Every structure is written in C-alpha cells, then in structure tokens.
Regions:
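Non-catalytic accessory regions flanking glycosidase/transglycosidase catalytic cores in CAZymes
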Residues: 19-74, 389-391, 405-406, 410-430, ...
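Generic structural signal for beta-strand residues in well-ordered domains
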Residues: 28-30, 170-172, 203, 223-226, ...
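Aromatic- and carboxylate-lined catalytic core of secreted/periplasmic carbohydrate-active enzymes
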Residues: 267-271, 278-282, 294-431, 444-461
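Short, flexible, glycine/charge-rich loop motifs used to bind or transfer phosphoryl groups or to couple energy/partner
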Residues: 14, 69, 167-170, 200, ...
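Extracellular glycoside hydrolase catalytic/binding regions
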Residues: 176, 182-322, 331-337
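Active-site mouth of glycoside hydrolases
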Residues: 25, 30-244, 254
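Bacterial Sec-dependent N-terminal signal peptides
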Residues: 1-22
Length: 461
C-alpha cells in the first residue's frame, strides 16, 4: 500500500515542487481589441489545437513524448486534454487520481521519483507531461472534470469548490496552462457547479485563460458570456451532418454561424471551434455504418470558422482523441486505426497551412468581411467566406466555385492576386489588377467538394 499523505482539503495551501525552467513559455492573454489571443509580450497567438483527451490516462512517458513531439512538429500549439475523465479511472501505470472515487480526496503520495513506483503517482505523471509540453512550446488546455460526472451527480458543489481550488493552485505557476471548464457539458444544467469551478480557477490561477467546453452544437456564450471568469468563448459544432442536426439552432455543418453569433456579442470576447467533426469518425458519431468525416471536412470547418472571425481552431482525430491502442477492450465511435497511425492523418498534416497563412499577414487587424464577395455567398458546401486586413484579403471556397470580388475593399490602386492551396500550403500567382469595380476569379480545376482554394489579394505599394 502507498502512503497517502494528503487529501485536497489539506493540500489547498501546499504548492507542488517543479523544476525551474529558465526558458518558460510566455503566458497567454486576450488581445487589446478583444478579438484574438496573444502572449504576454504582445505577439500574436493563433490557437491551433489538437484533441488529446486521454493523454494523461492512456499514454506512458515515452508515448506522451512521441505524441507531443509529433504535434509540435506539425505546428500545433495547444493540446486539449481531460484531467479526470471518470472519477474511478486509473492511468497507464495503474494509479488512480482519487481516494474512493471522491473528487475532493486526492490520492497523493510522498515523493515523485519515476524510479520509485510508490512515489510516482497519477498527479506526478500529469506534472511530467505538463513539463514535457512546455519544453516543446505547447500549451495544455485542461478540462478539470468531464461533464458526464457532474451530470450523473457524482460531484456536489463543495467537492467542486475543493477540487477546483486545489487543481488551480497546483498548476498556477505553469505558464502553459489554459482551462476548459465544462467538458461536453450543457451550461444550463448544474450551472452552480460550473460557476464554482470557473470562479475557483480564476481566484487561484489568475494568470491563466479560462473558457468553457460545451455540449455538441452549443456554445459557451449561451450561458457564460458575461461571467467574469470566462476569457474567451468556445463552441462545439459537433459531429453531425446537416440532416442529422435536430437541435434548435439547426446549424448543421455551418460552424461559421457560431462565430457570427459570438462576434456580435458585448462585451467582445474571442471565440473558436473547440470540437468540430473529428477526422476518422462516423458522421453522426455513433453509427460506424455511416460515412466517416475526412480531411476535406476538417479543412472546411477550419477555414470557415477562422475566416468568419475565429481566433483559432481545434482539430481532432477519432483515434488520437481516445489514444486508441492495441489491447483496448472498449474502443469507441467506430475507430479504425491506432493513435500512432493516425498521427499522420492527412488533416493533421494540413492544419499548419492555415496557421501559416493567418500569421503571414498583420494579425490583430483582421476582420470578417462578406462584402468582399460580390456574388451570392452560397449555402452549405457552396458557402464562401471572406476575411481581410487593411492591405490583404482572403476568400475561401470549399469546392472551387468562381469567386466574384468587389474590389476596393483593401488599400492600394492595384492588387496582386494568387491562389493558396489549403491541401498543400502552396501559392500560385494569378496576376496584378486594378483595385476597383468587380472581378471574377476562377479557381484551378473542376468544381468538386474538397478541392478547396483561398483567393489571396494583396495591396501593391
């Protein structure tokens, strides 16, 4: 038996021991115009997230290093991960987080040496991965407790208060932490518990950003937009097709509509899609006889939402989000490959192109501007979306339809036009044009869903 030396109620005032790192990641903040994120030095931060929900519980130290190395190499800078998925879960080393599944009773042992099995506990493993991520330039967006536990009545208000305070204090000095309150949760249910968790994190980790990860086809702004603890909004556009969406909003796959809604709210807060359809998961989520979402789909979600005004985007893959590996007894959602194979999925490799495109131009001045499009914007897969700064504009088409542009929206008497390929990241010059009137641009190739293009317009000075 391990020596249990603490419970949350006794640990609230105890700070964990961490190695000092002379090259700490800068903390994150909301930009001055409240539309975007930046680091504490004022540099742009484009959120490019990956979904690694079960990183802490399913991967050992070497596997975690492999995963984080890969995501850093592919340009991701945020990993979304759950601290407590189920209250009785154990990690890959057989360690449980809690005493008796009670969220207010931590199972913490003396020491943290990996060579000593009695010392290295569940929380030490998380500490180790947090530091691994920081060393690779990665931020971890932590869900304190998955929403199903709260829905099922396994967490009461006092337990939530104790746990959230302890957890926030434990990681308060780690610069690479972001908080995702909720966790596939409806904020109008158990609202008092979600408010308590948000307030405790804000009180005890005041330098960390906080948002709320909501239930599918809903958004944090529906319940918490005015909460003092909520720094930016997040929505989950979810995993359903147009014909599968039976919600009141009925936005289906049009995730740009969530951004449009949040963009109009006061006070101004950044927003992003924190869970679109995952690559490699059945359409509708639960029935593996349905078609599976692919790289074309996740690109569409990414460009639609970011060009509509989003401050970033979170990608996900079915196998990676659940860290599916050989020997898993209950793999979920029709998963067809192991996480190690899915690391190189096409969509995961293509996400960096969006990040590079956005960061190639002045970041904080960018706005959505549909008035650039002189023709019909289109519906569903025909929808075109435009964004611009003072001397540049991007217009996205998912299927290569002609783009008719109302010129004169950016500075300069002349503009240079080019095609940016979201599948490869390559740019092809079209030519120079007078910056007035309207002009039609015909993308390369046929009109086919998934043959997507970004029209890039730049002022010639």
């Amino acid at each position: 038996m391990r020596l249990i030396i603490g419970i949350f109620t006794l640990l609230l005032s105890i700070c964990p021991l961490h190695k000092e790192n002379g090259n700490k990641l800068p903390r994150l903040a909301v930009s001055e115009n409240r539309r975007f994120l930046m680091n504490e030095n004022g540099a742009p931060f484009f959120w490019l997230g990956d979904t690694g929900w079960l990183l802490f519980s399913k991967l050992d130290r070497k596997e975690a290093e492999k995963y984080l190395d890969d995501r850093a190499e592919k340009g991701f800078n945020v990993i979304q991960v759950i601290v407590l998925h189920q209250l009785d879960d154990t990690n890959v080393y057989g360690d449980s987080a809690l005493i008796g599944g009670n969220i207010s009773l931590a199972k913490v042992t003396e020491g943290n040496s990996f060579e000593n099995q009695k010392a290295y506990d569940f929380w030490d493993h998380i500490d180790y991965i947090v530091k691994l991520a920081e060393e690779r330039g990665l931020y971890l967006a932590l869900v304190p407790v998955w929403g199903s536990n709260v829905r099922q009545g396994k967490v009461n208000k006092e337990q939530a208060r104790t746990y959230a305070a302890w957890l926030a204090k434990r990681f308060a000095d780690n610069p690479n932490i972001i908080w995702l309150n909720g966790g596939d949760a409806k904020g109008n249910q158990n609202t008092d518990i979600w408010e308590i968790i948000g307030q405790q994190i804000r009180q005890h980790a005041p330098n960390h950003l906080i948002t709320f990860h909501p239930f599918g086809r809903s958004k944090s702004s529906m319940w918490f937009h005015n909460a003092d603890w909520l720094d930016f909004n997040m929505f989950q556009s979810g995993h359903r097709r147009y014909d599968q969406d039976d919600t009141e909003l009925a936005y289906g796959q049009d995730n740009w509509k969530y951004v449009r809604d949040d963009y109009s709210l006061e006070p101004i807060k950044p927003t992003l899609d924190g869970e679109p359809s995952y690559e490699g998961i059945p359409q509708g989520l639960h029935d593996p006889s349905q078609p599976y979402w692919n790289a074309d789909d996740v690109r569409r979600y990414a460009y639609w939402s970011v060009f509509a005004g989003g401050c970033g985007f979170t990608y996900g893959h079915n196998a990676v989000m659940q860290m599916h590996k050989p020997g898993d007894q209950n793999p979920e959602y029709g998963v067809r490959e192991y996480w190690t194979e899915a690391l190189d999925a096409k969509g995961a490799q293509q996400m960096i192109h969006l990040k590079n495109l956005i960061l190639s131009k002045p970041f904080f001045e960018r706005i959505p501007d549909q008035s650039l499009i002189a023709s019909e914007k289109g519906e569903r897969y025909d929808y075109q979306v435009a964004t611009r700064g003072k001397d540049y504009a991007f217009i996205y088409t998912y299927n290569g339809r002609d783009i008719k542009v109302k010129m004169g929206k950016i500075d300069g008497e002349k503009i240079s036009a080019s095609w940016f390929n979201p599948r490869s990241g390559k740019t092809t010059l079209i030519g120079d044009y007078e910056n007035k009137g309207t002009r039609n641009f015909n993308p390369p190739g046929k009109i086919v869903n998934g043959i997507d293009w970004v029209l890039v317009l730049e002022s010639i000075k």
